A protein has these predicted regions:
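Predominantly extracellular beta-rich ligand-binding scaffolds that present long acidic/polar faces
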Residues: 1-240
Length: 240
């Protein structure tokens, strides 16, 4: 399925209430068998996305979450089988002010596998709470049972308000997470220090997650009022 229609979210009137936006808003699977999970296959989005959080201006579960393909993916707490995104592609640029926003799925919360998915879209974010946004061009945050295989980001990510950001994801949040053959080539721009929740691949990882045959290229920089200043990531400084 392919969509060219723009998507607009005008915000939520209630605080502390989840709102999701994407070609698919909320992806759920009981996770007890292959027949009780959701599978998104060959979905492509070209439509631009615009979103405002309204009163739901948090950066956690009870927030407005925007993804080019899906807003949120989750399974039950007893799940052992995963929701699957296969060959999903986002070309749509995002102009949003939500606490979570991503090219593929804003939150890969539990048991979600992404395979051969690519983001080309720009993620331009102006979350009103300075320093609080969690942004990643594939996803913002992971939970248990997450596996990304051959996932690629080629879009830039800009946080105008010092948000935490990563080219693939913002927060690696479980020890069992796996990233295999994943690549990021986009710029990550935010007025934060380069090693403070900001990176070409992920913003933060304090978990024993597995990374195999991944590429972290692109660049990091500061927004600087719109006159962006890039660090110039290279082989000599990319591990700083």
């Amino acid at each position: 399925c392919t969509s060219y229609l723009p998507m607009v979210c005008e915000g939520n009137n209630s605080a502390n209430k989840l709102m999701t936006m994407g070609l698919v808003g909320f992806v759920y699977g009981a996770g007890t068998s292959e027949d009780t999970v959701s599978q998104l296959t060959d979905l492509t989005n070209y439509g631009a996305l615009k979103a405002d959080p309204g009163a739901a201006n948090a950066n956690g579960f009870t927030s407005t979450q925007v993804g080019g393909i899906a807003g949120f993916s989750n399974t039950s707490r007893t799940s052992t089988f995963a929701n699957r995104f296969l060959r999903c592609i986002n070309h749509g640029d995002m102009t949003v002010s939500t606490g979570r926003a991503s090219g593929i799925v804003a939150a890969a919360n539990r048991y979600t596998h992404l395979t051969d998915c690519t983001n080309y879209g720009l993620n331009d974010n102006a979350f009103p709470r300075s320093g609080y946004a969690r942004l990643g061009n594939i996803t913002c945050i992971t939970g248990p049972g997450i596996k990304f295989t051959n996932v690629v980001n080629r879009g830039d990510l800009i946080s105008r308000t010092k948000g935490a950001a990563g080219g693939i994801l913002c927060l690696v949040n479980h020890n069992d997470n796996e990233f295999i053959g994943c690549e990021s080539y986009g710029r990550v721009i935010s007025d934060r220090p380069d090693n403070d929740y900001k990176g070409t691949f992920f913003g933060q990882c304090k978990k024993a997650a597995k990374f195999r045959n991944c590429i972290a290229q692109g660049d990091v920089g500061t927004y600087n009022g719109g006159d962006c200043i890039m660090t110039g990531v290279n082989a000599d400084n990319y591990m700083d």
